[in-house]
Amino acid sequence: MKMEFDFKEEKSRIFGDVLRPVAEVIFVNNKREILESVYVDSGADITLIPKSVGELLGFKIGKNDKIEEIKGIGEIGIPIVIKKLKLRIGEKTVNARVAWSLIEEVPLLLGRIDIFRLFDICFKKEEKTVFED
């Protein structure tokens, strides 16, 4: 199965208009489903969601949850809890771990763990992101 997503044009403070690779993903937890446009980030180890998206999915910090800290560009630590849910990309549903950020100021990222091993992902000349299984 092949799925294609157009790059999204956005403003950059430094570069002006830029095209960024995105995909439409449905996050599923219990009976809750949320459709989001996420950045496809081959540099991200794990899928990252902001606090509000996790709350909409019904996430809570449980007694067995461990608050970790992850870092990206700039080495600024972000408190997260690893959660499991289902992701639907096109017609394919996968079990995935996500880093639920305990702060709001993070982008939605589709990271490598549990996702990239299932698809061939190709970035086509700043036009499309193609997922093929």
Describe the residue ranges of each PLM region.
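Pepsin/retropepsin-fold aspartyl endopeptidases
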Residues: M1-D133
